[in-house]
Amino acid sequence: MEEIIKVIEIFFDTGKTKNLGVLKDIQLNSPDFSSFSDVPPFDLKDFATSIALEELRFVSISDYDYEIIKPKISIFDNSAVVAFELLQKGMLVDNKAFTGEHMSITGRGTFVLIKNEAWKIVHIHLSKIKDS
């Protein structure tokens, strides 16, 4: 279970480290990959679109921090479902206008992972409960 939660932590740590390359390493580059989010566009996204939007999101937030709260990990053979509450904080930066806005978001997430040689994310669903 520890290696599963580590994959989720690597995903969100990208917001702190800005090491965007790991996003492609921990997610399954396959037509089977999908993601949903509460950030437009709201449609079901494929691997390439998800990576591009994640990179844009993580580089647009400075002083990023997060907390995964009450994770529930269910393992089924070579797949796992991780459901959790999520607190994200940081400064949303507009580099063109040289402005920033503090953000604090309480949300929830569900990640589905599969294991071949290593655990990889095959589906992400993130949603806001409220902005603080």
Where are these regions (language model features)?
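Short, aromatic-enriched amphipathic alpha-helices that serve as compact interaction elements
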Residues: 1-19
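A solvent-exposed, acidic/Ser-Thr-rich amphipathic alpha-helical stretch
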Residues: 2, 20-75
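Short beta-strand segments enriched in hydrophobic/aromatic residues
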Residues: 27, 86-88, 125-128
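Short, cysteine-centered beta-strand-loop-beta hairpins and adjacent loop/turn segments enriched
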Residues: 60, 89-102
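Short, surface-exposed coil-to-beta transition loops
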Residues: 66-68, 83, 104-109
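A short, structured loop/turn motif at beta-sheet edges
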Residues: 73-82, 113-120
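A short hydrophobic beta-strand element
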Residues: 77-94
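Short beta-strand edge/turn micro-motifs at domain boundaries
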Residues: 103-132
